[in-house]
Amino acid sequence: MTSERKMLVTSALPYANGHLHLGHLVEHIQTDIWVRTHKMLGIQCISVCGDDAHGTPIMLKAEQLGITPEALTAEIKLSHEKDFKAFAIDYDYYHTTHSPENQALATTIFERLQAGGDIVKKTIRQFYDPVKQMFLPDRYVKGTCPKCAAVDQYGDNCEVCGATYSPTDLINPVSVISGVSPVEKESEHYFFDLPRYEELLKDWTRKGHLQTEVTNKLSEWFEAGLKQWDISRDAPYFGFPIPGVPDKYFYVWLDAPIGYMASFKKYCDERGVSFDEFWDKASKTELYHFVGKDIVYFHALFWPAMLAASGFRTPTAVYTHGFLTVEGQKMSKSRGTFIEARAYLAHLHPEYLRYYFAAKLNGRVDDLDLNFDDFVNRVNADLVGKVVNIASRCAGFINKRFDNRLSSELNDQKLYNDLLSARESVIDAFVSRDYARAIRQIMDCADKVNQYIDANKPWVLAKDESKLNEVHAICTMGINLFRILITYLKPVLPMMAKASEEFLNSEPLHWDSIDKPLLNHRINTFKPLMVRVEKEKIEAMLVQSKESLMTTPVKENTPVEDANLISIEDFAKVDLRIAKIVNAEPVEGADKLMRLILDLGDAQKQVFAGIKKAYDAEELIGRLTVMVANLEPRTMRFGVSEGMVLAAGDGQGIYLLQPDAGALPGMKVK
């Protein structure tokens, strides 16, 4: 089966400041299934992705860790690639936006936009952190909501009342980075004149390049009016400098989608493929992007407009999916449902999740819910109970009674043809991204096979030596029907398909390889292809993921007059200092300990604190706290602890002390 079609497929680029979680995997599994489907059809289908490696969050996290942004993003990229490989997500090339290819393409596109009159310069006012000497993105300013007076709200929207506003509207604004009150400063920024392309975008968005619900949503944005898009950021910033403009950088969202092109460019350079054939304005190839609904605005408006304005082709389609919920709710660290890929892999087989997501994904923008009872039932009933059970039951007889050799003919050609007749419908469902429909059809076929085996009862016939030919024919039929089923499931379960190919002693399975059954063919000894999900492993995964509160014994209240009172002179001996947590990591082998690196302004100290069960390491980094700076160092088996952080506890939890806005590392607490 071959085709003249040529396709390039991408997934949204994971941000390079943290590990993958199950929410990421929805999209990447969805993309991988679609790509595998087309490759099995003989289509040249190239899939590329990479890490989104620029921006303020990466710059600040690297600073907190005491490493360069390049070192941080390189480490995270390795983690992402390792997780993708474990889940059998097989990109033809996986790159990074911090690459020579991306810088060259971003510069080319910017210069073309500038030459075409699409870049506008405007002076804007924004918050500036006088301590860090940097302009602050919206999410790095917090304060009191101007609408409902809720405290500790971000600079772009209130999580209590839902209001949106400018950071300068906040009451008592504070820099999240330094804790000081920011000041307003002017800066000249570069804008892409998106409204110039409103008619082009209206036409493009209504020509079948998007799902209907996405097109309808975009209509609302058109009615509200498109706005010029700020594509520049001020130094300090981790990204690409704007050519010829001192201290100005391309905004991460300008070069991030260009990263698709850069990853493909690297692929082309290494394999001798024509980049222009796929990206030229007159290209006859197909270009598909898979994205989440939270970034539709960038991919369905900015991206096609920017491509068209700079002389490149626009996407054939942008396919949008919904969010992942767990047990009907948003993923939550406190409930243990914010599950990283590596936590899942420590307890469960990756193809359980590939199958479950496939069974629930369709071509719409619906959210997908991971319900663990449903997860267990689907995997155990469908994969183990229906599909694998067919091979297991039939192979046992073939291996033991017939020297691993199948019989020379099928005994129910009609049933074989019946399963083959589902092929086009299954392929259509996968191509339409309605994987749930494909899975339903495949399981309907599996039911027919199990009914056939149950009706013929080879285990009963095997007791009669005169019936062994019938047993041989029935089990040969079962093995061949299993071969059809595993071919249909191959885009979803590539690891199980490969193991099945080894068991069947066959060439790699393709959509047309099942036209001829395996007859008078020697198979290999059957080995278990998949085992049942154990609920205990799910519970262990949730425990590992959970940000549970530490519980401590409740002490009886003691009257103040009975306490061991100290003098003011004794208290003065304790050197309490404001400290900034620049790094935090759990201590392996210790249930409670977290290793903290604390910045005191003129020095750094290492402290081991018993807060591991109360906080995630990531949420501690960058916070200010209070420490005892002159405590005698204590040698522990994990290292030397050079102080103590202060925390409050009520027997139900533990809470780090945090100073008020304006406090700086090294300040003395009096």
Swiss-Prot record:
Domain of life: Bacteria
Co-factor note (free text): Binds 1 zinc ion per subunit.
GO biological process per UniProt: methionyl-tRNA aminoacylation
Residues that, per the record, bind Zn(2+): 145, 148, 158, 161
Subunit record text: Homodimer.
Top enzyme class: ligase
Cellular component terms (Gene Ontology): cytosol
Residue sites binding ATP per the record: 333
Required co-factors: Zn(2+)
EC number: 6.1.1.10
Cellular localisation: Cytoplasm
Main location: cytoplasm
Full protein name: Methionine--tRNA ligase
GO MF annotation: an example: tRNA binding
The reaction(s) this protein catalyses: tRNA(Met) + L-methionine + ATP = L-methionyl-tRNA(Met) + AMP + diphosphate
Similarity field: Belongs to the class-I aminoacyl-tRNA synthetase family. MetG type 1 subfamily.
Residue ranges annotated as motif 'HIGH' region: 14-24
Function: Is required not only for elongation of protein synthesis but also for the initiation of all mRNA translation through initiator tRNA(fMet) aminoacylation.
